[in-house]
Design a protein with these regions (language model features):
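Short active-site neighborhood of thiol/selenol oxidoreductases, capturing the structured segment around
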Residues: 14-16
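Local cysteine-cluster metal-coordination motifs and their immediate loop/turn environment
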Residues: 18-29
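Short, amphipathic alpha-helical interaction segments positioned at domain boundaries
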Residues: 366-380
């Protein structure tokens, strides 16, 4: 069995900014409104956590992702300070992918130009819908015109790698409305689209309402139409919910799916490092008081067993349309995949939910629709 995560292999960094102007009605992420003092105190604690990190010494960092929340609500100088600390502490690779999430109306041209000077080379813009009526249903604070202003400003600032987030199966949304949304956004010619189906999360305003939701057949048709229509505009589906122009796949997310090591900094941020998975506390007070001592804010899981790692290899890798490599499985774990998962693989191949070609195993189109059930069978 080949040892994983040797120190000369690349790793990734995630930075969590838990602030937003207003929490959206469907959102269950660790985020909420804040004032200038809360933001400044948080960034100070974040920088202390970065400085105190023991992991990652000598490792090349292939990607940095600043997410939230809405990172663009921060004054741009804070983003500059965070990236400066990352660069001093870690070895950022040449041509590393550095992404920040931006919501429309929270980043003007000056802020976007500042991001460019800080070395940020990829934007992920949270549009969700180009339909103002749907944006109101979702509780979004922006309208489509504000998105267009942000998008145009990003292009003028020099960003040539932009993702746009879209959401399907929104309350009262029709199949025809979703098709219109896809064509509207694809016509803007971004490099990447993320298209997620709406999920009603417990504890959100959505969960307490009576909503007129598209039925399962409509959701199925919306999903199938997404890949077909985006392909017309030059996008290829490379993951269950992600579509990219050639060579513009989100390298950071691909890193998650191939189990590349990553360190997460900030409130609630999770990490995978070697055989350890751990996450920071979600208690803001505890985080602010203890961030300079990482062990005090981390909530560790038991070390990953070989069975855990094999299961993760399968259910994370199967999220990608290219699936998993049988040879890579054997290289990492020293066993043939059929010796470990033969029964599960035969079961789903016979149902045509899993396919095998050229030494790779991947979900069929029908398999994608029941992917959670398929992937659950690989759990130890």
């Amino acid at each position: 069995m080949e040892r994983r995560n040797i120190t000369d292999s690349p790793m990734e960094i995630y930075i969590h900014i838990p602030f937003c102007i207003k929490k959206c009605d469907y959102c269950d992420f660790l985020s909420g409104p804040s004032g200038p003092k809360e933001q400044a105190d948080y960034v100070d604690a974040l920088l202390e956590e970065i400085n105190a990190a023991e992991e990652g010494k000598g490792r090349s960092v292939s990607s940095v992702f600043i997410g939230g929340g809405t990172p663009s609500v921060l004054d741009e100088r804070f983003i500059g300070e965070i990236l400066n600390h990352i660069r001093r502490k870690f070895q950022i690779a040449d041509h590393a992918e550095i992404t920040i999430e931006v919501n429309p109306g929270t980043a003007d041209r000056n802020k976007l130009q500042a991001y460019r000077t800080y070395g940020i080379n990829r934007l992920s813009i949270g549009l969700q819908s180009p339909d103002d009526r749907e944006l109101k249903i979702l509780g979004r604070i922006h309208n489509y015109e504000q998105f267009l202003e942000t998008y145009r400003s990003a292009r003028e600032a020099g960003f040539d790698n932009i993702n746009i987030d879209l959401m399907s199966a929104i309350p009262d949304q029709t199949y025809e409305g979703w098709i219109h949304n896809l064509r509207t956004v694809a016509g803007l010619d971004p490099e990447h689209n993320s298209a997620y189906s709406r999920i009603i999360e417990e504890g959100t305003p959505f969960a307490s309402r009576t909503l007129n939701l598209p039925d399962e057949d409509a959701e199925y048709n919306m999903y199938e139409a997404t890949a077909q229509i985006l392909r017309e505009y030059g996008f290829e589906q490379y993951e269950i919910s992600n579509y990219a122009k050639k060579g513009r796949e989100c390298r950071h997310n691909v890193g998650y799916w191939i189990r590349q090591d990553y360190l997460g900094f900030g409130l609630g941020a999770s990490s995978l490092y070697g055989k350890e998975r751990f996450a920071n506390t979600q208690d803001m007070k505890k985080y602010l008081e203890n961030s300079r001592t990482p062990e005090k804010i981390r909530e560790k899981e038991p070390p990953l067993t070989r069975e855990d790692e094999m299961a993760e290899f399968m259910f994370l890798g199967l999220r990608m349309t290219r699936g998993i490599s049988k040879a890579e499985f054997e290289r990492q774990f020293g066993s043939e995949i059929d010796a470990i998962y033969g029964d599960v693989l035969r079961k789903y191949k016979s149902m045509r939910l899993l396919l095998e070609e050229n030494g790779r195993i991947f979900l069929s189109r029908e398999g994608i629709h029941v992917s959670n059930s398929v992937m659950a069978d690989f759990l130890p």
